[in-house]
Amino acid sequence: MNKLQGAAALLAALISAAGHAAQYQLSNDGIAFTFDDASKKLSIKDAGSGHLLSPKEPFFLTLPDEKVIHAADFKITRVEKQGDTLRVGYAHPDYSVTLTLNVLKGKYASIGYTVAAVGKPREVAKITLFPTAGQSQAPYVDGDINSSPIVADSFFIMPDKPIVNTYAYEATTNLNIELKTPVQPGSPVSYTVYFGTFPEVSQLRRSVNLFINAVRPRPYKPYLHYNSWMDIGFFTPYSEQDVMTRMDEWDKSFITGRGVRLDAFLLDDGWDDRSGRWLFGPAFSSGFAAVREKAASIDSSVGLWLSPWGGYNKPRDERVSHAQEYGYETVDGKFALSGPNYFKNFNQQILSLINNEHITSFKLDGMGNANSHIADSQFASDFDASIALIHNMRSARPDLFINLTTGTNASPSWLFYADSIWRQGDDINLYGPGTPVQQWMTYRDAETYRSIVRKGPLFPLNSLMYHGIVSAAHAYYGLEKVQTDGDFADQTWSFFATGTQLQELYITPSMLNDAKWNTLAEAAKWSRANADVLVDTHWVGGNPTALEVYGWASWRKEKAILGLRNPSDKPQRFYLDLSRAFEIPSGEATAFTLKPVYGSNDTVPASYDAPTVITLKPFETLVWEATPAR
């Protein structure tokens, strides 16, 4: 080969090498991804602040013997860009990993991780995603709950599953998944990490709330419904006729009578045969056809209660007593959703209810263990199984309303699957002074503050199950008695002021007079009309357990809403600072005209332009609408 040929060959090689190395970019108005396939370097940039996050490596695997397989131990086999998506394939003799980078909804981003074994099942103790070091100033996890969002400079980082552990310490951050089952060649495990940004510290909660509503399967929308619990059923079966009678009563007094749409009649515990197979009981031998048709005739639908772990008290014991007969797995005296046999049946039955009975909402009550692994299960825990179940349910009917109760926690990641979760604590209880209704309200809100506001400050209050409005014949602690009009109005308006979209009515119709029906109708209509504001609802004020004044605030540019309550039997002063209460962004109006929606208080100015001290009377509940002053 002469010198000229050699030079040409070298040049061709360099061109070829350069052709195989490239830098890829994805971007939208909020975030930009950059990936260099030669250096394997990945970075994400906040378009607004310029802050940059670049992980030490995109991922790494830790084996049971603590050996670590780094991303550098993999070979990149493919990089494919299509629209707003970039896929990167990583190959290793024992594992394959695919990264899927996406920019979402105009200002967010995500990285999907899919991990599979090669050749045979492989043990992996832990998968670590997006590990950073020294990339941000004092990053932290905002919340005490596993999988709470990581906050790093102007970024918030969230996993798609509540079983993922988020970690931040001394300028390092990562997301970890501990695996209890081998990774399979044909059944990869998948996780997604979401990224969003916030323009200023005061807007972190609102930015997270907006992000969740943008990507959740069913955007925020009030779901107002009757629930049979403590009314026609309370650990007891009920009949088709019981349900039809209630439908007639609600139609007469509320739906047709006062022009309020009821989204559903939810049938709580009492409809199944208690065999543990989730089959219809004798009272519904023909399924829900009759009640479904009746509901449709009044522009409503049917919702349904099921309990993955089997329910509560004697009905649960009766269901679980059949576990051995049908080969269903149990843990601690309850069904285990992650058990192969039980999951197969539960999943099959719930899909049948969706497809054949046209159920529009589910109250899944009791999600089971988070730490126990069932032998031969494909799932690490019942939490893992519940995520798979909900995915299947959504695939069958995307617009389902899914409420998860006991067994969940204040991880915002639940809202990538469910529409609401439990506020924690007891169904109903009493705390503090006052009538049973006032004590119930204080307990409800004290539990919310203790378990949600403090432990999961970025969890949207608009997606909590508060246990609704209670005035039912089989309730307890005094809530089974007819309430005064004032107490019922306080309970009703304070409930709708929470902004929750799960609007449960545990009400026996005969316990409401015309005044109460009017209150309920007015508040429900107000909630639906103001949903675009109430979606932003967040906590204001103090701790109900300490009997401090507290409440709820929500804001949008055109309008804001404030609800306050004094849980004490003594008058209390409250420092009213609407800029702080509404979490108003920089540059927006801070002077308002206040319009009373519920209650009246002479110490509250009709025109607000500066912080002021107001006084709430004992047990006073107040709700205002605030519009920017002209």
Label the model's feature ranges:
Residues 1-8:
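Bacterial N-terminal signal peptides that target proteins for export
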Residues 232-237, 301-357, 368:
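Active-site-adjacent "subsite" loops/lids of carbohydrate-active enzymes
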Residues 22-87:
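Acidic-aromatic substrate-binding/catalytic surfaces of carbohydrate-active enzymes
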Residues 227-244, 271-285, 328-345, 368-383:
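The substrate-binding groove and active-site-proximal loops of carbohydrate-active enzymes
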